UniProtKB/Swiss-Prot annotation:
Composition bias type Polar residues, residue spans: 176-190
Keywords: Coiled coil, mRNA processing, mRNA splicing, Nucleus, Spliceosome
Subunit structure: Associated with the spliceosome.
Lineage: superkingdom: Eukaryota
Name of the molecule in the record: Pre-mRNA-splicing factor SYF2
Lineage: Eukaryota, Fungi, Dikarya, Ascomycota, Saccharomycotina
Cell compartments where the protein resides: Nucleus
Amino acid sequence: MNLEDYNEKLKLLKKSVQDIKIRNRNLLKQEAEEKEKGLKPRVYSMHDDEDDSDEKRSSDEQSDMRTNLFQYTVQDFIDWEKRQQRKKKSKLESKSGMRLQHLAKNTYDKELQNLPRPEFKMKAKETQFRINKDSGKVNIKDNKELVQRLSQNLKETAKQRYDSNRKIANDKEHTSLSGSINAKNLQFNKSLDDDHEAEK
């Protein structure tokens, strides 16, 4: 086959594509007209099968879905894909380290709120600050007592959280390894194991 034959085939394919598009539009128009006609109240007999009405409903739903699908543009589809990717990304971030960062920030903010403000009010004259020549930012010296109290409170909170998590982990480990709920249950399980080994 030479180039002219391929060119002819391409023209035929393009023409068939256009014919199919026209046929699809006509079918959609017919379905829409039938649907409008179908909205009029109908008279049903008592002996009509419910299955027939279910089939009609499902065919109507399918035609509605088809017409809705033709109303979306490529740009709508691209936007929808981007939204789906953002949702997946946000789910992954919330499951991983973002949750811990959020917890750390909330803990820090709580500790700052818990610091007593009236004791450490500073007067404008006492405030010492410098302007950084490179960045142009203002550097203010923090009150050492406030910083130490904040660090002490954060350490206490972290220790409490660590102790509670360790206790929970130990409880889980103890019950899962031994398979017993309390000391009596543990003793009973050991006697059963001993009896079972003695029978062998």
